């Protein structure tokens, strides 16, 4: 048997139909052209009674843009004062006096001590992002999203643009559910509404498990938010019901979107997410509140954000339209003709590890590929999981966490902070149009060599094109992975000026797998340096769901020591509610705290003077690229 194929008999035979949708009786999904081009549709108008708002547990008040609205029990709060972006005088004081325990891992129990989330951003890239947003340059926004992530407080404007132009929305395909045509299914629209409402209430209970909230007694804004969510989910299921039936994960996707995109038009109200204390008496908050330190450090950013909230020119999509496109991206699967070719030649229970990284696969194929990579890249943790009978089989209540991670892209189980950064990566995924020259993209994106250097190469780069033939000849590789590497590097092959090394390394993997950084003086001679307009733009190489798979492996690697101290039940519980990767540094480690932001490197931080945090998500995404290259290298060696 060829080593290119993974036998999935041991992994997918026990997959529960409750968790995974197979591709039986699959058909082509059809979407009207308006989905890819339509900007606005029917939108719900916010309640007129804006003065009756829920209480913010931190400050005693909750804010609309540029104005504070004092709650009934505000008591000692300043009344009638105007604060930029709704920030009260007590907000910064609370943030600066917050400290975490020495062993704080960012879990929900410790989030009350986290203060504002960790966030730092290069000012030049931020200005570039603003320019792309103003000019509606979706290619530029996608580039920033996948390379550096988006400023969190701009996602509400940028995500709709990225989703509108995403390749999976322009050419959608959702893997059909083989149970969707079940004749015994007698669920009515009222039953569907009841299911959606029940799942929405689970979110509220998850936030306020010590203080249950009755939506009938909630503020008008909260009621309206959940009403919009319910109608958006219902509309999606009714439209796409012939392809897939309702799953409660669809509600959690909508809730995840509402944590960054305000459901009520022209407001900044978003759901709080589980990163906040459970004592909160409100389910909504001002999107900009968490990033006030950063916003106040950028001149005129307050006014800019206020204008964006009320803007209808850049993008004007309703929540339901953004939600529909979001689901199409997260649940995209390869078209049937691609899968049929593989099945006709290889058999239904074999997946080609050469093809899947580029073309993607069904959720069953991705789960099998994940387990294969997991055992190869993290052998000790994989062995411990086997001893604890984790990932040995799939049932309705066993290892459902992996389905939430891989199929539903972290909905429900990941922190909103971590999920937001990973969704940036997925939404920014773009392949290069080979009909366009590289200089066209440089000019179109208005990039200097300095900005290209700051953005860096694609995170999932592989061996350089000039190294392909000599490397594979040196190690006598099979045509399988030579073809894979050639396909991964077709971008470089279209550009004769790509600056790469001319010979493989004889000593180390890192030297052999050189990143295609255009400004690395050590990787090429001065005679090979291309003009600035010929530098390579970092386009995506792997399928976005395969990128997510390696991000998942990086997350597991980051928690390997913790996981190996837990038993079976604790592991599943931990992975079903993964702590945020943004943690706080306590007084014990203050001597490791960096000094004030270096103005020379143009980095602006959201940290306050006495409250420094670390956001590990960029490290996680970088590590996922390293794991990809480690896997690719090991496959090349094994094929020898």
Swiss-Prot record:
Family statement: Belongs to the OCA5 family.
Region listing for Disordered, in residue ranges: 39-116, 492-520
Gene: OCA5
Cellular component GO terms, alphabetical: cytoplasm
The UniProt record lists the keyword Glycoprotein: no
UniProtKB keywords: Cytoplasm
Compartments, as annotated in UniProt: Cytoplasm
Domain of life: Eukaryota
Biological source species: Debaryomyces hansenii (strain ATCC 36239 / CBS 767 / BCRC 21394 / JCM 1990 / NBRC 0083 / IGC 2968) (Yeast)
Protein name: Oxidant-induced cell-cycle arrest protein 5
Gene3D superfamilies cross-referenced by the UniProt entry: Ypt/Rab-GAP domain of gyp1p, domain 3
Compositional bias of kind Polar residues: 39-48, 61-76, 107-116
Rab-GAP TBC domain mapped to chain residues: 149-430
Transmembrane segments: none
Low complexity bias locations: 85-95
């Amino acid at each position: 048997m060829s080593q290119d194929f993974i036998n999935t008999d041991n992994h997918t035979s026990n997959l529960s139909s409750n968790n995974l949708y197979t591709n039986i009786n699959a058909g082509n999904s059809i979407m009207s052209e308006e989905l890819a081009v339509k900007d606005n549709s029917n939108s719900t108008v916010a309640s007129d009674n804006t003065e009756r708002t829920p209480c913010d547990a931190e400050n005693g008040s909750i804010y609309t843009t540029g104005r504070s609205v004092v709650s009934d029990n505000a008591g000692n709060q300043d009344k009638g004062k105007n604060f930029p972006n709704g920030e009260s005088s007590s907000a910064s004081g609370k943030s600066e006096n917050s400290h975490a325990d020495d062993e704080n891992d960012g879990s929900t129990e410790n989030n009350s001590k986290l203060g504002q989330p960790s966030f730092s951003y290069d000012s030049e890239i931020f200005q570039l992002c603003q320019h792309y947003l103003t000019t509606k340059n979706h290619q530029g926004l996608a580039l920033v999203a996948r390379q550096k992530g988006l400023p969190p407080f701009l996602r509400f404007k940028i995500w709709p643009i990225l989703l509108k132009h995403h390749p999976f929305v322009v050419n959608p395909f959702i893997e059909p559910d083989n149970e969707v045509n079940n004749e015994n299914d007698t669920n009515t629209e009222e039953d569907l509404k009841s299911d959606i409402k029940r799942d929405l209430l689970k979110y509220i209970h998850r936030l306020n498990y010590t203080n249950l909230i009755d939506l009938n007694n909630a503020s008008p804004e909260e009621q309206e938010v959940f009403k919009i969510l319910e109608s958006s989910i219902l509309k999606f299921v009714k439209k796409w019901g012939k392809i897939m039936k309702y799953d409660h994960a669809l509600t959690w996707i909508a809730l995840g979107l509402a944590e960054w995109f305000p459901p009520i038009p022209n407001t900044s109200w978003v759901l709080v997410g589980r990163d906040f204390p459970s004592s909160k008496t409100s389910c909504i908050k001002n999107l900009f509140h968490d990033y006030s330190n950063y916003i106040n450090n950028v001149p005129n950013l307050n006014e800019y954000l206020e204008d964006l909230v009320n803007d209808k020119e850049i993008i004007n999509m309703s929540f339901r339209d953004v939600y529909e496109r979001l689901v199409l991206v997260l649940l995209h699967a390869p078209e049937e003709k691609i899968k049929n070719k593989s099945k006709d030649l290889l058999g239904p229970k074999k997946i080609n590890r050469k093809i899947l990284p580029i073309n993607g696969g069904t959720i069953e194929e991705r789960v099998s590929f994940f387990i294969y990579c997991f055992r190869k890249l993290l052998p000790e943790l994989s062995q411990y999981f086997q001893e604890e009978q984790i990932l040995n089989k799939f049932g309705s209540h066993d290892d459902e966490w992996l389905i939430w991670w891989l199929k539903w892209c972290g909905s429900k189980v990941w922190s909103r902070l971590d999920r937001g950064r990973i969704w940036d990566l997925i939404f920014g995924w773009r392949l290069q149009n080979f009909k366009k020259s590289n200089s066209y993209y440089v000019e179109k994106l208005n990039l200097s060599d300095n900005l290209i250097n700051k953005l860096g190469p694609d995170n999932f780069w592989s061996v350089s094109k000039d190294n392909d033939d000599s490397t594979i000849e040196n190690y006598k590789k099979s045509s399988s992975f030579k073809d894979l590497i050639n396909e991964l590097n077709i971008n470089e092959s279209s550009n004769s000026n790509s600056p790469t090394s001319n010979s493989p390394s004889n000593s180390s993997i890192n030297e052999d797998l050189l990143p295609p950084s255009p400004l690395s003086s050590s990787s090429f001679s001065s005679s090979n340096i291309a003009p600035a307009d010929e530098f390579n733009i970092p386009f995506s190489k792997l399928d976005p769901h395969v990128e997510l798979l390696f991000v998942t492996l990086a997350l597991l690697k980051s928690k390997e020591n913790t996981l190996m101290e837990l038993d079976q039940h604790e592991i599943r519980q931990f992975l079903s509610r993964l702590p945020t990767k943004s943690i706080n540094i306590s007084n014990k480690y203050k001597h490791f705290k960096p000094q004030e932001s270096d103005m020379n490197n143009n980095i602006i931080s959201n940290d306050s003077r006495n409250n420094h945090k670390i956001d590990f998500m960029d490290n996680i995404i970088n590590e996922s690229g390293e794991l990809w290259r480690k896997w690719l290298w090991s496959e090349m060696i094994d094929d020898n």
